Amino acid sequence: TGLLPKAKNIANRRIKNANYYDKNFSKLPQITIPPRPKNFKLVYHLYIIFAENRDQLLKYCLKKGIEAKVHYPKPMYMQESVKFLKHKSGDFPTTDEHTKKIITFPCDQHLSLKEMSYVVKCVNNFYKNKI
């Protein structure tokens, strides 16, 4: 059997995982969860948040064995493919701010509740110890 018949279950599991993260990370003032469009079903291949002290959080998570990443380290308007538009650093301050804070966590359908709880626990511990 191929992947297509399983796609709905995979999507639902990823949504469930993202909802778990949303519920837990929304309790932390140092984390901002991007707005979720109404009447739109997001299927998360990445779980993206904006985090204070992102670089330190990333190092901490990696040290704890969590596959956290910065998938978008450079603002879109500064990418090589749009260089011809001649934008310069600072042209889009909101984008620049988000770029400094964006971090992703695993969200795929194979994650167990125990694994996601560990991610949440580590992020909570990081911020608890930062205060």
Residue ranges and their predicted role:
Residues T1-I131:
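PLP-dependent aminotransferase class I/II
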